[in-house]
């Protein structure tokens, strides 16, 4: 359902809705965890778990997607937080972070499982221009690693800084 909304699909009006080789109209419940591993989602309002630290937010995602080994989880959490410059916030609660910091944490969460595609809903919508520019640079770097980024935005000038195909 979330993907239908994000991709502006209306049930009944779309013959086929395929992502990463899976038709969303007929996907089986047991196939969804595998799809989630291949997708990263960045929500406009971050969707961090407010009762958990950054580390615990990430542990929750990794456990839910099948990461059994604690050492592997800890290593991956540190890797992605270093990548977005947020390792010093690992034990902070979401309410202790600024909007830009929460967005970088949300991006780190989206790349935890090395997804093939990231869907970003207004990733710069609630941010000041400088922080927004930093977020766009970060997403641009992620695309250089082979991950596709599908982004919705009202910030048209920002799109000029982003590589790839742009639908307006």
Predicted region positions:
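Conserved ABC transporter NBD signature motif
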Residues: 15-23
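Conserved ABC ATPase signature
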Residues: 93-97, 101-103
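Helix-to-loop junction immediately C-terminal to a conserved catalytic motif
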Residues: 7-8
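Catalytic Walker B motif of ABC-type/P-loop ATPase nucleotide-binding domains
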Residues: 118-121
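Short coil-to-helix segment of the ABC ATPase nucleotide-binding domain corresponding to the Q-loop/switch region
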Residues: 52-60
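Helix N-cap at the start of a conserved alpha-helix in ABC-type nucleotide-binding domains
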Residues: 129-131
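Conserved catalytic motifs of ABC-family nucleotide-binding domains
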Residues: 114
């Amino acid at each position: 359902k979330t993907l239908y909304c994000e991709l502006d699909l209306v049930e009944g009006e779309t013959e086929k809705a395929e992502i990463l080789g899976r038709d969303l109209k007929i996907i089986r419940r047991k196939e969804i965890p595998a799809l989630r591993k291949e997708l990263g989602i960045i929500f406009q309002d971050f969707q961090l778990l407010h009762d958990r630290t950054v580390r615990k937010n990430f542990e929750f995602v990794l456990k839910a997607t099948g990461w059994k080994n604690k050492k592997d989880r800890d290593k991956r959490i540190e890797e992605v937080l270093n990548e977005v410059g947020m390792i010093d916030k690992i034990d902070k609660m979401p309410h202790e972070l600024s909007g830009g910091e929460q967005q970088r944490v949300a991006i780190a969460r989206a790349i935890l499982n090395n997804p093939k595609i990231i869907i970003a809903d207004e990733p710069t919508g609630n941010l000041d221009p400088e922080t927004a520019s930093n977020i766009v640079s970060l997403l641009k770097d992620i695309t250089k690693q082979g991950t596709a980024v599908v982004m919705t935005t009202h910030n048209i000038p920002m799109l000029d800084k982003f590589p790839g195909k742009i639908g307006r």
